[in-house]
Amino acid sequence: MKNPKLTVIRSLLVATSLGLLLAAGQPQGLAQAPAARPAKAFKYERLDKNNAAVLLVDHQSGLISLVQDFSPSEFKNSVLALADLAKYFKLPVILTTSFEQGPNGPLVPELKELFPNAPYIARPGNINAWDNEDFVKAVKATGKKQLIIAGVVTEVCVAFPALSALEEDYEVFVVTDASGTFNETTQQAAWSRMESAGAQLMSWFGVACELHRDWRNDIEGLGALFSKHIPNYRNLMTSYDAIQAAQKPAPKSK
């Protein structure tokens, strides 16, 4: 006959042993999780007209005919708006083309006319502009660390140099409406790839406003630029001009 006291003692020993084994198997610190680290504060990196350069990549007559994510007139207007704002803010501009003698065609003439003295790098075959030594030298010669990039096509001629510049610690701002490609699917994929790598996606209008900072710096000048490329903006400037004229004191009669 079994001794009841021995049975109870054995049960207690087994329970104690199991408890020790379970405790030993737990990761250290499980009972008290470490305090969560505070999230890193977001830093708003603004465009600075004193530290920015504009790279216009492969806006060539042949390549532009491939752009389908914007209408031809809409796209051309955005490209020229970016060019005009670069001139307005006196930003260094670098023009580059790829394989001009092939189907890509020459640089669109309006850009060459706007920037006759800008560095013009006709790449003999480099698909990625950053693979061209002369192009990179021209970028570095500006002394600017913020690069405003636009081009055709978005997933190649914009994305490749944008990613390369990010790798070399430049701040990259991609002008989405002055960059074009075959369709919205490739557009979105290219934007996602660049944004996830650290590029900021902006419109030409956003670029202009961020560079300008304050309307009081020059109302008429920036307003004229906007009116040239945004038809409805002319209504705002017409209204503003009328108010300004009405507020002027009448000339004194002699």
Model features per residue range: what roles?
Residues 1-7:
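N-terminal secretory signal peptides that target proteins for export/translocation
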Residues 120-140:
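Glycine-rich oxoanion-binding loops at beta->alpha junctions
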Residues 124-127, 177-180, 207:
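Short, acidic/turn-prone active-site loops that include or flank metal/cofactor-
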Residues 146-204:
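A contiguous pocket-lining binding segment that forms or flanks enzyme active sites
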